[in-house]
Amino acid sequence: MEVNIYGLTATALFIIIPTSFLLILYVKTASTQD
């Protein structure tokens, strides 16, 4: 079974980018509430 590196990279980016974006927004809101 051959692994499609481009599909794997696209999937990883599709998951990592929104997650890190939400994480940054959450940290900013949590720090401003202090």
Curated annotation (Swiss-Prot):
Membrane topology, as annotated: Single-pass membrane protein
GO BP terms in the entry: photosynthesis, light reaction
SUPFAM superfamilies in alphabetical order: Photosystem II reaction center protein M, PsbM (SSF161033)
Record-linked InterPro entries: PSII_PsbM (IPR007826), PSII_PsbM_sf (IPR037269)
Taxonomic superkingdom: Eukaryota
Major localization class: plastid
Localization, UniProt: Plastid, Chloroplast thylakoid membrane
Membrane-spanning segments: 5-25
KW Protein transport (keyword) present: no
Main function: One of the components of the core complex of photosystem II (PSII). PSII is a light-driven water:plastoquinone oxidoreductase that uses light energy to abstract electrons from H(2)O, generating O(2) and a proton gradient subsequently used for ATP formation. It consists of a core antenna complex that captures photons, and an electron transfer chain that converts photonic excitation into a charge separation. This subunit is found at the monomer-monomer interface.
Protein name: Photosystem II reaction center protein M
Annotated organism of origin: Chlamydomonas reinhardtii (Chlamydomonas smithii)
